[in-house]
Amino acid sequence: YAYTLTKNPNFPGNFEGQTANIETVIVKYTPQDTMMDQLKTGAVDILYQVADGDQIEQGLDMVEEGNFNYLSYGRAGYGMISLKCNQGPTQFKEVRHAMAYLLDRVTFAQTFTGGHGTVVSGPYGTQQWMAEEYAEELDGLNSYTYSLDSAVKELEDGGWVYNEDGSDYSGSGIRYKKLDDGTYMPLVIEWFSSENNSVSDLLVTSLQQNPDVEAAGMKINQTVGTFTDLLTYYYDNSTENPYQMFNLASGFGNPYDVAFQYEPGSSNNTNALEGEEGQKLYDLALAMNHTEEGDDEAYAKAWFDFIADWNDELPEIPLYSNDYHDFF
């Protein structure tokens, strides 16, 4: 897709009388695997917010060769696995924890960003001032260091201790959990990912096809489709939604305001985290907004309290927070 913007001849200018110097701007979708070639051949003039490590390195090589330049800056956002907390296995916190333990997020972040990013413990960017203020406290949060044993313990503590027929788990195959209605739920997670996505490709090898996922008694099924379809399922909070797992990224505004994303019953609450846990997280997010203007210390404390509770509930699994690069 592409959108064409043309200079408005009726615009009087800003307060200094300045008007646009460029007559036409075309904003177009550029596939990740061809974006650098398009920049090199002049098919595009600017690549904005490049995040993939391989593409960044290719762009930096082009800059070193001459004729191109770049800007880099810390991202006020992060990439994540978003999970539905109202249906399927991911409605149970122990499953969300187990998934985090089964993904080597340090290696994932290093591989995807090419060293231009790092792992975070919640929904924030490493260069946001609150994260810098509370760096030591953030280091004390659960980092979900890769561990099959920790994943298995979470699942056992969560009641995933049965075979399909209700007998004690045999130690191989899919685990099951006995629900309140007497039925047994298989530990099978349905994942919808967008096509031509390098993060999805990396998640296939590092999580979905990771032998330790099978060893833990878990299975993740991947369905690939368009990004438009992904958003349809991502915003569907009904219990009939066939998918519980999505990978995408999110940016944060200034000021940092995420309360609307966790309001119970809201369509913006895409994790569908409800009940006492959801209300608590929402109240903590609201506390930031209710801080007296100018009281940075109180705001940062409220921010950390929200992050700490989020880190335990884990409605999403943080993958990376990275530096953006613009090439031109």
Which residues does each PLM region occupy?
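Append "and occasionally in soluble cytosolic enzymes with long acidic Gly/Pro-rich linkers
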Residues: 91-209, 305
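Extracytoplasmic/peripheral linker and loop segments enriched in polar/acidic and small residues
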Residues: 97, 144, 217-231, 256-328
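Ligand-binding "clamshell"
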Residues: 56-72, 241-242, 255-271
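Second-shell loop/turn segments in exported
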Residues: 24-26, 82-88, 95-98, 134-144, ...
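Short helices/loops that flank or line small-molecule/ion binding pockets
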Residues: 33-45, 51, 61, 93-94, ...
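A structural signal for short loop-to-beta-strand junctions that line the ligand-binding cleft
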Residues: 66-76, 120-123, 317
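Ligand-site clamp/hinge motif
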Residues: 10-58
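Short, well-ordered beta-strand elements
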Residues: 3-4, 22-28, 185-195, 220-222, ...
